[in-house]
Design a protein with these regions (language model features):
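Amphipathic alpha-helical scaffolding segments comprising HEAT/armadillo-like alpha-solenoid repeats
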Residues: 2-12, 42-56, 78-93, 111-127, ...
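Short inter-helical turns and helix N-cap capping residues of alpha-solenoid HEAT/ARM repeat scaffolds
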Residues: 61, 94-95, 126, 134, ...
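Structural detector for internal amphipathic alpha-helices that build alpha-solenoid repeat scaffolds
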Residues: 28-43, 55, 62-79, 89, ...
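Long alpha-helical scaffold regions
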Residues: 17-18
Length: 187
């Protein structure tokens, strides 16, 4: 896929500066990335990142997806609805490591239209999560379903109660006890 010439320079700069991310007080920081894009509008940042996601998916480049997700976070764009379809597509791709981040972003949205996707992510059998006996991804998905708080979300949590894994059942039950599931199932 050809990068649109409009965003080619910005994407290269974004990827280069993303490599300079560091940790202070257990928080990821990248002041240089933020300052280099300070004159770029949020809409332009969204368009640049969306273009980058398309290209990274085509190349199956996990590092680029990670850098793009970091950029979304640094620019505080994670709750922008323009990314919902990208998050849905990325949640189904195994080549990257950002599934837990995506589950957390879904949790922020509280959108009934993401329920099926969140459930599919919770039951996905991606190889990289098969070692995780704490089921961190599943727990984040359960929280996202709980925060959506609709009858359909409750149904998906009840399906997770049927898991052979006790920890998954516990995560689902935690949300079933926490929520009242009275929000409307409007997609």
């Amino acid at each position: 896929m050809k990068i649109s010439s409009k965003y080619e320079k910005e994407l290269r700069k974004l990827f280069e500066l993303s490599k300079k991310t560091y940790i202070i007080n257990f928080q990821l920081r990248n002041e240089e990335l933020i300052s280099n894009f300070s004159d770029v509008t949020d809409e332009e940042k969204i368009n640049i990142i969306k273009e980058g996601i398309k290209i990274a998916c085509q190349k199956k480049n996990s590092t680029e997806i990670e850098n793009l997700m970091l950029s979304i976070s640094f620019f505080r764009l994670y709750d922008r609805s323009e990314f919902i379809e990208d998050y849905i597509k990325l949640s189904k791709k195994e080549f990257h490591e950002e599934h837990e981040t995506i589950a957390s972003y879904f949790q922020r949205f509280h959108l009934p239209q993401t329920i099926d996707c969140i459930y599919e992510l919770a039951i996905s059998n991606f190889e990289k999560y098969q070692w995780d006996d704490n089921f961190a991804l599943v727990r984040k998905c359960c929280f996202a379903l709980g925060d959506i708080n609709t009858p359909k979300a409750k149904e998906k949590l009840e399906l997770l109660l049927q898991s052979e894994e006790e920890t998954i059942r516990e995560h689902a039950m935690e949300q079933l006890k926490r929520c009242d599931f009275t929000n409307k199932d409007i997609e």
